[in-house]
Amino acid sequence: EGIIYTDVLVEVLFADDNDANLTNGTPNDIAIIQAFALHGITLLSNAVIAHSPISIAPANIDINISANISATYSWALSSANCFYRVNDNTNWNTLSMTANGNNYTATIPAQPNGNIVAYYISLTDNYGFESGINPQESNVIPIKDANLPFFVMVGYELYEEEDFDFNVGFWQTGHPSDIATTGMWEIGSPIGSYDDPSTLSGMVQPAYQHTPNGYACAFTQNASSINDGIGANDVDGGHTTLFSPYYNLTNYTNPAFTYWRWYTNNPSSGANPGADWWQVMITDDGVNWEYVENTL
């Protein structure tokens, strides 16, 4: 997927065309489009959705979502949509985004205090194929296999923030039950890991963390340099564990946690893609744990 493959698709359509006008279709356009779509290539594969995520919103006020959408083949853009769901609902609601030039907007209905709204943006081309998902792959079904969407916390106030830079917190890396031989959790400055270090493409471990102007995060072991192979210090041999501090939430109503994470399990040059999994769990007594995320 990307600009090169999309250009190849367009060249094939031009070769099939009989009136030098792709906007009105070609004799075999449906078969061509469907064949390329089987490989994840659409007319909008190189579209760019510029969007500033909404993370906090006041209660009982509509939540306005806006994005700037640009595409090389803008004539192929049929619609832009915002999908959202509330709390534990697994069904997505669809909002058609209104266009004003390259700017698109949608309004998520007002929500009461304590609700958490998940949402993502996607594009549909003239042939009905979805593309340009933002965040990428957040539309995958079942939800456990999907990337995280954007989340809006309605009516919440920030109580504690731990970013490993300005407030580290009492995090614990590792547990006696861990059996991983490489890729153990560390806290520090990450070194990027790439399928192709010469072009910095195919990123497996980011070379940066999320906090603006920060440098540190928790990660599963650095390689010696970005020139090492992606398997140099990946997680091998078993699991590794990272524990947050304990938080006393006795005096709080409907508390919520947020976190930023990067996880990949299918690099194109990986030795065994798709064989590992990611799990996040939470407990209120230190004994009984519930899954927050589980890709197994």
Describe each model-derived feature in a short phrase.
Residues 228-252:
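Short beta-strands within extracellular/lumenal beta-sheet-rich domains
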